[in-house]
Amino acid sequence: MRLASFERKGRPGFGIVVGDGVVDMAARFAGKANSLREVLASFGLKELERLAGSAPDFGVDEIAFAPVIPDAAKLLCVGINYMPHIKEMGRERPERPVLFVRFGDSIVGHGQPLLAPRESEQFDYEGELAVVIGKRARRVSRERALDYVAGYSCFNDGSVRDYQRHSPQFTPGKNFHASGAFGPWLVTTDEIPDPRKLQLTTRLNGAVMQHESVGELCFDVPQLIAYCSTFAQLEPGDVIVTGTPGGVGAGRKPPVWMKPGDVVEVEISGIGTLGNPVAAG
C-alpha cells in the first residue's frame, strides 16, 4: 500500500494512493482517527489493508501532499551514516549512531516549496530513506526490529551548513522552517521486505548528485531501531531518518547550494520520487 497525508479543498486528510486515485481514509475513519498516525496507533495496518480495495474517491491531482506523518511525535535523524559522506565531511566513522531531531514545521510534503533562508547561501540537499514505526517498540532486538516498521518513505534532510556548524549539535542548521521534505507517501513493508536492496538517487535540476544502495548504511535499519528503542519508547508514527550518502553539495569543489528556482528530487526504488521546488524563504 501507498499511504499519504494531504490537504484537499483546504482540509487535512489521509488515504491510500491507488494508481492516480486516492481512497479517502479520513472519511472512513471520521470520529475515530484524525490522521494516519492515529490510525497506525489505534487500528494498525490490517484495517487499512481491509479498505485498500475500495474504489478511489478522488484523483491525486486534487490533493496537495503533506509530510507523510505531519504530526509525528518523534522525528529522529541520523548523521554521517554512509562512508562516502563521512569522508567528504572530514569525519571519522562513529562508534554509535549520531542522532539529532527535526521539528515538525521544518518539513513539507511532496511538491511543496523548500524555503531557502535569507540568512545563508549554504542550503544543501540530503536524500535519505525514512522509516515509519508501526507499533510500540522499546528495547527491541536487532533481529526483531523490522517487525515494528509500518513502511518506508523518501526524505530530503535539507541542511543550512553554516548554521549546522554553529554548535556541536546540528539543531540550528537542520530546523529552518520548511527546509526539508518527507514523502510523497509511505510504502508498507509487505512491498519492501528488505530495505537494504533499495537504491537512492538525488537529483538537482535533473542532474544526479547522489546515487547509493541503502545496503551501504554503516548502521542499518534494524540497528537504528534497536538503538533508538533503548532510550526512547518508539510509538506508531514515529520516524527514523537513516542518513545521507556521499555527493552532498557541501562536499563538492566548488560547493553546490540549492537556490530559489531549483528543483530537487529524491528517488528511492520501490517507493517513488519526492520532488520539491526551491523558493526564497
Identify the function of each model-found stretch.
Residues 4, 65-67, 87-90, 114-123, ...:
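A generic local secondary-structure boundary/capping motif
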Residues 1-97, 265:
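N-terminal non-catalytic cap/leader segment that marks the start of a structured domain
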Residues 9, 46-49, 56, 62, ...:
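Catalytic-pocket segment enriched in acidic/His residues
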Residues 133, 140-155:
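RNA pseudouridine synthases
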Residues 5-7, 102-104, 125-129, 133-135, ...:
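Short, structured patches in soluble enzyme cores that scaffold and shape functional sites
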Residues 20-21, 105, 207, 271:
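Well-ordered beta-strand scaffold positions
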Residues 93-110, 125, 259-270:
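Structural signature of FAD isoalloxazine-binding scaffolds in flavoprotein oxidoreductases
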